[in-house]
Amino acid sequence: MLDISVIILTYKEEKHIERCIKSIKKYSDNIYIIDSYSTDNTIAISKSFNSTILQNKFINQSKQFAWALDNINFKTEWILRIDADEYLEDNLIIEIKNKLPNINKDIVGINLKRKHMFMDKWIKFGGRY
């Protein structure tokens, strides 16, 4: 397991949250769901994976993420923010496992390149690649 915590912002994400959490569980057990009072099964599904659930009124993504940073006592060196409808492919997880421990200690943040998928196809144009 990596020394990383994961923040997932949710609101009515029962359709996506299981796939997202399953991809994260391959490298971290420190999963924090910041939910905006979902009325579907988002919370129940997240709890079934032993995720930590916190709820906060949603204003915008930036404020919700900042709220998480201010209200969680992280015990890991790194924090990853991911949307509930996103997931990590195995090759990206391997790359994270191989590269993260070797990043210079002066670096405090990184940006991961992502594949944007639509209807099971990788979007490689329109500023998304």
Task: Tell where the protein language model's regions lie, with residue ranges.
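Short acidic donor-binding/metal-coordinating loop in glycosyltransferase active sites
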Residues: 36, 56, 76, 82-86, ...
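Acidic helix N-cap motif at the loop->helix transition within catalytic regions
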Residues: 18, 40-49, 91-92
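A short, glycine-/small-residue-rich helix N-cap motif at loop->alpha-helix starts
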Residues: 56-64
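N-proximal low-complexity "stem/linker" segments adjacent to membrane-targeting elements
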Residues: 1-23
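Short, acidic, metal-binding catalytic loop of nucleotide-sugar glycosyltransferases
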Residues: 22-31
